[in-house]
Amino acid sequence: MFKFKIFAFITLMTFAFGIALVGDALAGEKVKLRSVMYGTKWEQINVGDEEGHVIAVYEAKGIDTNMQGKKFMDGWLYRESGLMDMNGKAGTWSAQGYGECTDRDGDKIFITWEGKKDKKETGEGTNAILKGTGKWQGIQGKGTWVAVPAVDNRWYSDGELEVELPR
């Protein structure tokens, strides 16, 4: 159950980042997003050096919501993949990965993210836009996120992203 909560948490973080990239944002505008995600794949290897220490690869999917009521990234599909080094017994993890945000027309924004959780309920980190396709080609941005576990393999992530849209 712990691995699913962690998986959900990381997926949520990435999802939140994806939400920030869609819609009617202005150049240099900060966008507030919420991503709700669920884990779809999880593979782990026990490290063996201490109880609860594992390395895991996962995938998650979800939906982005623009918390400012704008169209940018609102309702976009989000897919995330990541690598996690975690200790379920200690309640800590560090992770990094990639996200793919897809708008209603099929154009995409790709992101990279990293973060950690140190014995608290939430994880936090940073993200950055790698590139966009179609109308999002040339988009740039970076931001922060906080992920919160919900139930089982589901979580949500709140983030803020400063975006510069393509010209």
Give the label of every model feature segment.
Residues 19-27:
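Sec/Tat signal peptide C-region and signal peptidase I cleavage site
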